[in-house]
Protein backbone atom coordinates (compact mmCIF):
# COMPACT_ATOMS: atom_id res chain seq x y z
CA UNK A 1 0.00 0.00 0.00
CA UNK A 2 2.91 2.35 0.80
CA UNK A 3 4.33 1.69 -2.67
CA UNK A 4 1.00 2.57 -4.27
CA UNK A 5 0.76 5.80 -2.28
CA UNK A 6 4.34 6.75 -3.19
CA UNK A 7 3.77 6.09 -6.88
CA UNK A 8 0.42 7.89 -6.69
CA UNK A 9 2.14 10.94 -5.22
CA UNK A 10 4.74 10.86 -8.00
CA UNK A 11 1.99 10.48 -10.60
CA UNK A 12 0.11 13.42 -9.12
CA UNK A 13 3.27 15.56 -9.24
CA UNK A 14 3.84 14.75 -12.90
CA UNK A 15 0.22 15.49 -13.75
CA UNK A 16 0.37 18.69 -11.71
CA UNK A 17 3.26 19.88 -13.88
CA UNK A 18 1.17 19.14 -16.95
CA UNK A 19 -1.73 21.04 -15.38
CA UNK A 20 0.44 24.12 -14.80
CA UNK A 21 1.65 24.00 -18.38
CA UNK A 22 -1.92 23.61 -19.66
CA UNK A 23 -3.18 26.52 -17.57
CA UNK A 24 -0.35 28.74 -18.81
CA UNK A 25 -1.32 27.83 -22.37
CA UNK A 26 -4.98 28.62 -21.67
CA UNK A 27 -6.19 25.07 -22.32
CA UNK A 28 -9.15 23.41 -20.61
CA UNK A 29 -9.32 20.46 -18.28
CA UNK A 30 -11.98 17.79 -17.87
CA UNK A 31 -13.52 15.05 -15.75
CA UNK A 32 -14.20 11.62 -17.20
CA UNK A 33 -16.06 8.41 -16.41
CA UNK A 34 -15.82 5.15 -18.36
CA UNK A 35 -17.48 1.74 -18.07
CA UNK A 36 -17.92 -1.27 -20.31
CA UNK A 37 -17.17 -4.96 -20.71
CA UNK A 38 -13.88 -6.86 -20.52
CA UNK A 39 -12.55 -10.38 -20.94
CA UNK A 40 -9.32 -11.75 -19.43
CA UNK A 41 -6.86 -13.79 -21.48
CA UNK A 42 -7.08 -17.55 -20.97
CA UNK A 43 -4.71 -18.84 -18.28
CA UNK A 44 -3.79 -22.17 -16.70
CA UNK A 45 -4.44 -22.94 -13.02
CA UNK A 46 -1.01 -23.51 -11.47
CA UNK A 47 -2.07 -26.19 -8.98
CA UNK A 48 -4.23 -28.43 -11.19
CA UNK A 49 -3.26 -27.57 -14.76
CA UNK A 50 -6.88 -26.86 -15.72
CA UNK A 51 -7.16 -24.24 -18.49
CA UNK A 52 -9.30 -21.34 -17.29
CA UNK A 53 -11.64 -19.09 -19.27
CA UNK A 54 -12.92 -15.63 -18.42
CA UNK A 55 -16.46 -14.51 -17.80
CA UNK A 56 -17.45 -10.96 -18.72
CA UNK A 57 -16.30 -8.37 -16.21
CA UNK A 58 -17.18 -4.68 -15.90
CA UNK A 59 -14.29 -2.18 -15.89
CA UNK A 60 -14.98 1.22 -14.32
CA UNK A 61 -12.68 4.27 -14.42
CA UNK A 62 -12.89 7.80 -13.03
CA UNK A 63 -10.39 10.47 -13.97
CA UNK A 64 -9.30 14.05 -14.36
CA UNK A 65 -7.39 15.37 -17.34
CA UNK A 66 -6.09 18.31 -19.33
CA UNK A 67 -5.94 19.33 -22.97
CA UNK A 68 -2.22 19.95 -23.44
CA UNK A 69 -2.74 21.03 -27.04
CA UNK A 70 -5.41 20.83 -29.71
CA UNK A 71 -4.63 17.19 -30.52
CA UNK A 72 -3.05 15.94 -27.30
CA UNK A 73 -4.48 15.37 -23.83
CA UNK A 74 -3.38 13.63 -20.65
CA UNK A 75 -5.31 12.32 -17.67
CA UNK A 76 -4.99 10.51 -14.37
CA UNK A 77 -7.51 7.68 -13.90
CA UNK A 78 -8.44 5.43 -10.99
CA UNK A 79 -9.92 2.14 -12.17
CA UNK A 80 -11.23 -1.17 -10.92
CA UNK A 81 -13.23 -4.17 -12.16
CA UNK A 82 -16.57 -5.61 -11.06
CA UNK A 83 -17.41 -9.31 -11.19
CA UNK A 84 -14.43 -10.73 -13.07
CA UNK A 85 -13.42 -14.40 -12.86
CA UNK A 86 -11.25 -17.00 -14.53
CA UNK A 87 -12.91 -20.39 -14.10
CA UNK A 88 -13.31 -23.87 -15.60
CA UNK A 89 -14.39 -27.39 -14.71
CA UNK A 90 -12.41 -30.38 -15.92
CA UNK A 91 -9.91 -33.12 -15.12
CA UNK A 92 -6.73 -32.02 -13.36
CA UNK A 93 -3.47 -32.74 -15.19
CA UNK A 94 -0.97 -31.87 -12.43
CA UNK A 95 0.10 -34.24 -9.63
CA UNK A 96 -1.11 -34.99 -7.01
CA UNK A 97 -4.55 -34.26 -8.52
CA UNK A 98 -4.10 -35.94 -11.92
CA UNK A 99 -7.40 -37.25 -13.26
CA UNK A 100 -9.52 -35.68 -10.51
CA UNK A 101 -12.59 -33.85 -11.80
CA UNK A 102 -12.50 -30.38 -10.29
CA UNK A 103 -13.86 -26.88 -10.70
CA UNK A 104 -11.39 -24.01 -10.29
CA UNK A 105 -12.19 -20.32 -9.91
CA UNK A 106 -9.87 -17.30 -9.64
CA UNK A 107 -11.63 -14.06 -8.68
CA UNK A 108 -9.30 -11.05 -8.85
CA UNK A 109 -9.49 -7.70 -7.11
CA UNK A 110 -7.69 -5.07 -9.19
CA UNK A 111 -7.23 -1.37 -8.45
CA UNK A 112 -5.07 0.67 -10.81
CA UNK A 113 -3.92 4.30 -11.00
CA UNK A 114 -2.76 5.26 -14.48
CA UNK A 115 -1.26 8.29 -16.19
CA UNK A 116 -2.58 8.26 -19.76
CA UNK A 117 -1.70 10.22 -22.87
CA UNK A 118 -3.85 10.44 -26.02
CA UNK A 119 -3.19 11.77 -29.52
CA UNK A 120 -5.92 12.54 -32.06
CA UNK A 121 -4.99 10.72 -35.26
CA UNK A 122 -7.72 12.21 -37.44
CA UNK A 123 -10.24 15.02 -37.02
CA UNK A 124 -13.52 14.70 -38.90
CA UNK A 125 -16.53 17.00 -38.72
CA UNK A 126 -18.56 14.49 -36.69
CA UNK A 127 -15.91 12.59 -34.71
CA UNK A 128 -12.20 12.14 -33.89
CA UNK A 129 -10.08 8.98 -33.88
CA UNK A 130 -7.42 8.74 -31.18
CA UNK A 131 -4.72 6.42 -29.84
CA UNK A 132 -3.35 6.36 -26.33
CA UNK A 133 -1.16 4.64 -23.79
CA UNK A 134 -1.06 4.55 -20.01
CA UNK A 135 1.16 3.29 -17.20
CA UNK A 136 0.95 3.23 -13.42
CA UNK A 137 0.70 1.13 -10.27
CA UNK A 138 -1.88 -1.60 -9.74
CA UNK A 139 -2.86 -3.51 -6.60
CA UNK A 140 -3.74 -7.09 -7.56
CA UNK A 141 -4.96 -9.99 -5.41
CA UNK A 142 -7.27 -12.96 -5.92
CA UNK A 143 -9.61 -15.41 -4.22
CA UNK A 144 -8.96 -18.98 -5.37
CA UNK A 145 -11.71 -21.58 -4.95
CA UNK A 146 -11.71 -25.30 -5.78
CA UNK A 147 -14.65 -27.70 -5.84
CA UNK A 148 -13.68 -31.36 -5.87
CA UNK A 149 -10.51 -30.81 -3.83
CA UNK A 150 -10.77 -30.14 -0.10
CA UNK A 151 -8.38 -27.76 1.64
CA UNK A 152 -6.77 -26.14 -1.40
CA UNK A 153 -8.83 -22.93 -1.66
CA UNK A 154 -6.97 -19.79 -0.57
CA UNK A 155 -6.65 -16.01 -0.85
CA UNK A 156 -3.52 -14.17 -1.98
CA UNK A 157 -2.35 -10.87 -0.52
CA UNK A 158 -2.11 -7.64 -2.50
CA UNK A 159 0.81 -7.33 -4.86
CA UNK A 160 1.89 -3.98 -6.33
CA UNK A 161 2.53 -4.28 -10.07
CA UNK A 162 3.14 -1.87 -12.92
CA UNK A 163 0.05 -1.81 -15.13
CA UNK A 164 0.20 -1.02 -18.87
CA UNK A 165 -2.62 0.12 -21.14
CA UNK A 166 -2.94 0.63 -24.91
CA UNK A 167 -6.04 2.30 -26.34
CA UNK A 168 -7.64 2.99 -29.71
CA UNK A 169 -10.93 4.85 -29.84
CA UNK A 170 -13.23 7.47 -31.26
CA UNK A 171 -14.90 10.49 -29.69
CA UNK A 172 -17.68 12.87 -30.69
CA UNK A 173 -19.04 16.07 -29.20
CA UNK A 174 -22.64 15.55 -28.04
CA UNK A 175 -23.17 18.88 -26.28
CA UNK A 176 -21.25 22.05 -25.49
CA UNK A 177 -18.24 20.92 -23.43
CA UNK A 178 -19.32 17.25 -23.43
CA UNK A 179 -17.75 14.47 -25.51
CA UNK A 180 -18.69 10.79 -25.75
CA UNK A 181 -16.07 8.09 -26.33
CA UNK A 182 -16.05 4.50 -27.54
CA UNK A 183 -12.71 2.75 -27.10
CA UNK A 184 -10.90 -0.60 -27.15
CA UNK A 185 -8.10 -1.08 -24.61
CA UNK A 186 -5.62 -3.84 -23.86
CA UNK A 187 -4.47 -3.85 -20.23
CA UNK A 188 -1.75 -5.88 -18.49
CA UNK A 189 -2.08 -5.75 -14.69
CA UNK A 190 0.67 -8.30 -13.99
CA UNK A 191 0.62 -11.38 -11.77
CA UNK A 192 -0.80 -12.06 -8.32
CA UNK A 193 1.39 -13.40 -5.54
CA UNK A 194 2.09 -17.13 -5.45
CA UNK A 195 1.16 -19.06 -2.33
CA UNK A 196 2.11 -22.53 -1.10
CA UNK A 197 -0.71 -24.59 0.43
CA UNK A 198 -0.08 -27.86 2.27
CA UNK A 199 -2.32 -30.58 0.82
CA UNK A 200 -2.09 -34.02 2.45
CA UNK A 201 1.50 -33.36 3.45
CA UNK A 202 2.52 -32.01 0.04
CA UNK A 203 3.30 -28.35 -0.67
CA UNK A 204 1.19 -27.17 -3.61
CA UNK A 205 1.82 -23.81 -5.31
CA UNK A 206 -1.29 -21.73 -6.07
CA UNK A 207 -1.86 -18.16 -7.28
CA UNK A 208 0.62 -16.43 -9.57
CA UNK A 209 -2.13 -15.76 -12.11
CA UNK A 210 -1.45 -13.17 -14.82
CA UNK A 211 -4.30 -10.78 -15.56
CA UNK A 212 -4.37 -9.34 -19.07
CA UNK A 213 -7.65 -8.08 -20.46
CA UNK A 214 -9.39 -6.87 -23.60
CA UNK A 215 -11.74 -3.98 -22.80
CA UNK A 216 -14.53 -2.28 -24.74
CA UNK A 217 -15.72 0.85 -22.95
CA UNK A 218 -17.97 3.84 -23.41
CA UNK A 219 -17.16 7.09 -21.66
CA UNK A 220 -18.09 10.71 -21.16
CA UNK A 221 -15.73 13.70 -20.89
CA UNK A 222 -17.00 16.86 -19.21
CA UNK A 223 -15.01 20.06 -19.78
CA UNK A 224 -14.62 22.15 -16.63
From Swiss-Prot:
Q: Which InterPro entries match?
A: OMP/PagP_b-brl (IPR011250), OmpA-like_TM_dom (IPR000498)
Query: Where would one find the signal peptide in this protein?
Result: 1-22
Domain of life (superkingdom): Bacteria
Give Gene Ontology CC terms.
cell outer membrane
Q: Does the keyword Signal apply?
A: yes
Q: Keywords, A to Z? A: Signal
Pfam families referenced in this protein's UniProt entry, alphabetically: OmpA_membrane
**Could you tell me what this protein is called?**
Putative adhesin RF_1314
Q: What organism, scientifically named, is this protein from?
A: Rickettsia felis (strain ATCC VR-1525 / URRWXCal2) (Rickettsia azadi)
Q: What is the lineage of its organism?
A: Bacteria, Pseudomonadati, Pseudomonadota, Alphaproteobacteria, Rickettsiales
Amino acid sequence: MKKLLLIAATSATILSSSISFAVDMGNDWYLRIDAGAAMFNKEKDKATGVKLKSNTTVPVDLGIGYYISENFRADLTLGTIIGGKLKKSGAATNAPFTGTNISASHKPTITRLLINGYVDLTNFDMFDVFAGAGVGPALVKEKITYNGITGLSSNTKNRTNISYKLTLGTSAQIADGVKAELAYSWIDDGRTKSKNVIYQGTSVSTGGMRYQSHNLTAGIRFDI
